[in-house]
């Protein structure tokens, strides 16, 4: 049987095959076809219960949900999108919950979205360069410099002397070169970008990169050096074994297709026992004799003698490695240097100029905010004001001051439903640096009464000022070495709020 429609709806009105004019009909019926001229109350083609089943009529309107939500700390279009998405999901389901349940579901989704909004966090983990918490906090002067250029125009690419267009970051690059003991330096937007730029440049005509198998490391987030190199268009020529690589291994691998030798500093792990790898000086001599560029990726980017800070292990500096014969070095700006996320490359003036002429360089260059913060950080390092860099200040904080702060925090919590005491901790530099070094620290150890530790920990993370700590031996531990003294009051308030949070907020 072929069913032919005798009426159809256009722009809100029903048209009939028997009439050249729209025939609007208002009826007592319900559904999309209420005004169909074929019926006063129901459509024979689409029954009312099929078009608008009874279960769908209990779904609240978008406007009703928005009014019930009240004020939400999100842009209204984002809130509207979430509400519409949730209501659409209900329409596809088999059952529709009550209005209060629907409202709570929407609030839960909005809260999950809001928690991902970037904001300050109290770091009580004892990991100073915590990758998940943003690595190095900026020095106050660097933060001020960033804010100053963010709110105003700046001389990003103008020569204020003559008024013509000038070079980007020329002041920063000049001082970076001084800090690294190099002829020249430049900066891109992160450490991996620096390595990619170097590899793309040196393998444009000769595609092979010679690298030891013991240095094919994996960095944070599951990213692996071999994958990064291959994504750059290079072909890896692996030499040696995981624990044993000799200079002869490098020599035998070098050939007409060799574009560069790459040495990767194992900054996020260490090997001991039956291990061997040639020092930088020997690889540099071999590279010069073969006329092959030699690049060393330092990763963490120390610019000072780390062994003089709290008994840390030695971390090679850019100046040290260049002095040992490496052609170029690259490292991150937001680790031991204490600046913003950036990738720094230092070496001969001719090589740096060639890198900056690469078309790919423009895709990696930094904006004014990063340049302003990094410029101030480098200036402080050159001036010997490293004590103003937060991470270095943390490393040098004495135990007595940490104990004093812990006792004051405990005193402020005396009437709260918890057990709290001063504990011992072991802080780490983190961020893939100094893997063998730890620093004795002081913790505030909390047992939150009858509240489960996981619930207490989650409430702290979801509070107005999020607090991240660790659970060890049935205690929640907050390492004060990574908590700034200016955060102590907020820390106390966050702990109190977590203890008294209303049920259902978790």
Residue ranges with predicted function:
Residues 370-371, 375-430:
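Conserved PLP-dependent catalytic core of the aminotransferase class-I/II
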Residues 403-486, 490-491:
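Conserved C-terminal alpha-helix-loop-beta "cap" of PLP-dependent enzymes
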Residues 49-113, 117:
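Long amphipathic alpha-helical segments
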Residues 96-138, 142-145:
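Long amphipathic N-terminal alpha/beta scaffold segment
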Residues 83-84, 124-125, 135-161:
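Glycine-rich phosphate-binding segment of PLP-dependent enzymes
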Residues 2-21, 25-32:
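Short, positively charged low-complexity motifs
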Residues 162-381, 494:
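Conserved PLP-enzyme active-site core in the AAT-like
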């Amino acid at each position: 049987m072929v069913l032919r429609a005798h009426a159809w709806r256009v722009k809100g009105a029903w048209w009939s095959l028997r009439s050249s004019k729209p025939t609007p009909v208002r009826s007592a019926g319900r559904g999309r076809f209420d005004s169909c001229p074929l019926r006063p109350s129901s459509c024979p083609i689409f029954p009312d219960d099929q078009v608008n089943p009874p279960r769908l009529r209990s779904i609240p309107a978008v406007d009703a949900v928005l009014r019930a939500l009240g004020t939400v700390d999100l842009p209204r279009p984002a809130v509207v999108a979430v509400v519409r998405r949730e209501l659409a999901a209900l329409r596809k389901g088999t059952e529709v919950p009550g209005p209060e349940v629907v409202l709570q579901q929407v609030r839960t989704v909005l809260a999950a979205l809001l928690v991902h909004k970037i904001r300050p966090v109290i770091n009580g983990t004892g990991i100073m360069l915590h990758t998940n918490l943003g690595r190095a906090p900026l020095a106050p002067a660097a933060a001020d410099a960033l804010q100053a250029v963010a709110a105003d125009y700046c001389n990003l690419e103008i020569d204020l002397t003559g008024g013509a267009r000038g070079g980007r970051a020329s002041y920063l690059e000049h001082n970076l070169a001084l800090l690294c003991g190099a002829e020249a330096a430049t900066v891109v937007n992160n450490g991996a970008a620096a390595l990619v730029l170097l590899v793309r440049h040196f393998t444009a005509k000769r595609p092979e990169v010679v690298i030891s198998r013991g240095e094919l490391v994996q960095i944070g987030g599951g990213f692996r050096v071999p994958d990064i190199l291959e994504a750059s268009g290079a072909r890896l020529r692996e030499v040696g074994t995981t624990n044993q690589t000799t200079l002869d291994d490098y020599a035998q691998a070098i050939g007409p297709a060799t574009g560069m030798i790459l040495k990767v500093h194992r900054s996020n792990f260490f090997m001991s026992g039956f291990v061997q790898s040639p020092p930088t000086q020997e690889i540099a001599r071999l590279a010069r004799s073969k006329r092959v560029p030699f690049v060393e990726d330092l990763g963490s980017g120390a610019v000072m003698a780390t062994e003089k800070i709290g008994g840390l292990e030695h971390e090679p500096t850019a100046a040290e490695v260049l002095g040992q014969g490496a052609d170029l070095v690259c490292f991150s700006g937001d680790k031991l240097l204490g600046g913003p996320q950036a990738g720094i490359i230092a070496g001969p003036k001719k090589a740096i100029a060639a890198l900056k002429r690469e078309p790919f360089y423009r895709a990696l260059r930094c904006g004014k905010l990063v340049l302003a913060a990094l410029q101030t950080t480098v200036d402080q390092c050159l001036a010997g004001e490293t004590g103003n860099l937060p991470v270095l200040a943390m490393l040098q904080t004495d135990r007595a001051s940490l104990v004093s702060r812990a006792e004051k925090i405990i005193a402020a919590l005396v009437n709260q439903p918890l057990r709290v005491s001063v504990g011992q901790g072991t802080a780490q530099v983190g961020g893939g640096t100094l893997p063998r070094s730890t620093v004795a620290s002081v913790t505030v150890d909390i047992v939150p009464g009858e509240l489960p530790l996981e619930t207490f920990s989650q409430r702290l993370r979801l509070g107005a000022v999020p607090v991240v700590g660790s659970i060890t031996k049935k205690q929640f531990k907050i390492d004060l070495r990574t908590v700034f003294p200016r955060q102590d009051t907020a820390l106390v308030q966050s702990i109190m709020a977590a203890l008294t949070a209303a049920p259902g907020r978790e």
